[in-house]
Amino acid sequence: MHRIRLFAGSAALALVAAIPAQAAVPKVTGTVGPGFTIGVKKLAFKPGKTTLTVADKSGIHNFHLIGPGVNVKTSIVGSGTKTFNITLKRGLYRFLCDPHASVMKGSFRVS
């Protein structure tokens, strides 16, 4: 009886171990504010589905991401966190604050 339980438990454990773990969705993290600052944590990414999470720490700026097939932005009014589901394609992506684009801008590459 103990051997049957041990075998069944071992078989269940082997089955669970054989199921491949789902790969985590890569994340792009952007910030805007405080003051006249804007940025992303990394500057190089691989193509594919991802989430863009923006921490807006100012009520006078927005975070606008533009690139191949992507054009998303947060609101200028208010602050907080906003998340977008996007698909990155190979190429150059620019991020900026629309009202202050001459001084608040940057870019990253997807390759």
PLM features: what roles do these ranges have?
Residues 24-37, 77-111:
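Extracellular/periplasmic metallocenter environments
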Residues 69-75:
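Surface-exposed loop/edge segments in extracytoplasmic proteins
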